[in-house]
């Protein structure tokens, strides 16, 4: 396995670790509605950071974006909005199915859809099946899916042992939302594929290969921002129990506390895709579809490890922890299989 591929896998791991941890600061926000908290974090992650970093990278910010036709920008924006819908559905999926089943189904579907649809859309799937390296990477995707399933099973055992139940368990509604979440969340993978002309243009301007995907985030995350912020602002305006004014009428020290934590959460959310771009840049072009599989499977892996570090599994007993550990090992094996396949 080449150093470039190894570093690509490593950066995807770092990005996934940030994704697994990003909600921790949000949990410490006090006396704010979820909508206010999510909006503040979202403004940081979807608007401020993509624009600021692109302004630093590009020699002429406005000239870069104005050089693209609407036919190039619109699919990138819409796939970003698609991912934003997936974000909203994610929370509802957890509500009706519970964490373990919800994450298992949603992540499993988005891993398959986001990974395999890209080469199918590009007309390259037959090449993957007909080459040794392609078959090896597809095997890695299958093994990763098995690993996600094992970690999901560990979560179910943990919830059963600790008596944790879904907020409003509804299997039919939850399954529909989980499938929708999985499909729509894959929008980020599709957006990155659609944004290739933007990446090439950034490279032509002398942007470092590690950073060429970052300017496209202005458009991708702009689509996500419209959906997420629109959802939050509509609820803040229409739901009687929610009030943006009330949330910002608290003690000044508490407002600063909440803004800083929400900002940190937004920063960590953005960093998952900052390092995703770094990892994506190191993956061989013919296997760039694998980036999504690495990100999502490492997200599950890191989520399990973070749960162990935070002692969330302390009262779950030995069997759930053993199953979780097995799932994590399987995901690591999957990453190595994919790496070997890409090296071929």
Swiss-Prot record:
Briefly state the protein's biological role: Uptake of L-rhamnose across the cytoplasmic membrane with the concomitant transport of protons into the cell (symport system).
One Pfam family of this chain: RhaT
The subcellular localization recorded is: Cell inner membrane
What HAMAP family does its record include? RhaT
Under the heading InterPro entries, the entry gives: L-rhamnose-proton_sym_RhaT
Tell me where the signal peptide lies: none
Keyword DNA repair set for record: no
Entry membrane topology: Multi-pass membrane protein
Listed A to Z, the keywords are: Cell inner membrane, Cell membrane, Membrane, Sugar transport, Symport, Transmembrane, Transmembrane helix, Transport
The lineage's top-level taxon is Bacteria
The molecule here is called L-rhamnose-proton symporter
Q: Which family does it belong to?
A: Belongs to the L-rhamnose transporter (TC 2.A.7.6) family.
- Keyword Transmembrane attributed: yes
């Amino acid at each position: 396995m080449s150093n470039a591929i190894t570093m690509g896998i490593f950066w995807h791991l770092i990005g996934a670790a940030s994704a697994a941890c990003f909600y921790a600061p949000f949990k410490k926000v006090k006396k704010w509605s979820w909508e206010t908290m999510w909006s503040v974090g979202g403004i940081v992650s979807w608007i401020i950071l993509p624009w600021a970093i692109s302004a630093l990278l590009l020699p002429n910010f406005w000239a870069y974006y104005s050089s693209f036709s609407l036919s190039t920008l619109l699919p990138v924006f819409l796939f970003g909005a698609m991912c934003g819908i997936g974000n909203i559905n994610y929370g509802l999926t957890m509500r009706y199915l519970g964490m373990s089943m919800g994450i298992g189904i949603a992540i499993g579907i988005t891993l398959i859809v986001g990974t395999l649809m890209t080469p199918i859309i590009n007309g390259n799937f037959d090449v993957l099946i007909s080459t040794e390296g392609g078959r090896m990477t597809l095997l890695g995707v299958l093994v990763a899916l098995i690993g996600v399933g094992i970690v999901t099973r560990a979560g179910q055992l943990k919830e059963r042992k600790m008596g944790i139940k879904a907020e409003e368990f509804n299997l039919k509604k939850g399954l529909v939302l989980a499938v929708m979440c999985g499909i729509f969340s894959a929008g980020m993978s599709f957006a990155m594929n659609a944004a290739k002309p933007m990446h090439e243009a950034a490279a032509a301007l002398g942007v470092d290969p590690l950073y060429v995907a970052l300017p496209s985030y202005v458009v991708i995350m702009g689509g996500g921002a419209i959906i997420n912020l629109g959802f939050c602002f509509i609820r803040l305006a229409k739901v009687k129990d929610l009030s943006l004014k009330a949330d910002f009428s608290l003690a000044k020290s508490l407002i600063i506390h909440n803004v800083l934590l929400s900002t940190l959460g937004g920063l960590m959310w953005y960093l998952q895709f900052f390092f995703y771009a770094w990892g994506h840049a190191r993956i061989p072009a013919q296997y760039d579809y694998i980036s999504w599989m690495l990100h999502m499977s490492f997200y599950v892996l890191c989520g399990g490890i973070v749960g162990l570090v935070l002692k969330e599994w302390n009262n779950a007993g030995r069997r759930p922890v053993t199953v979780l550990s097995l799932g994590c090992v399987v995901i690591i094996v999957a990453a190595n299989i994919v790496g070997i396949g890409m090296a071929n």
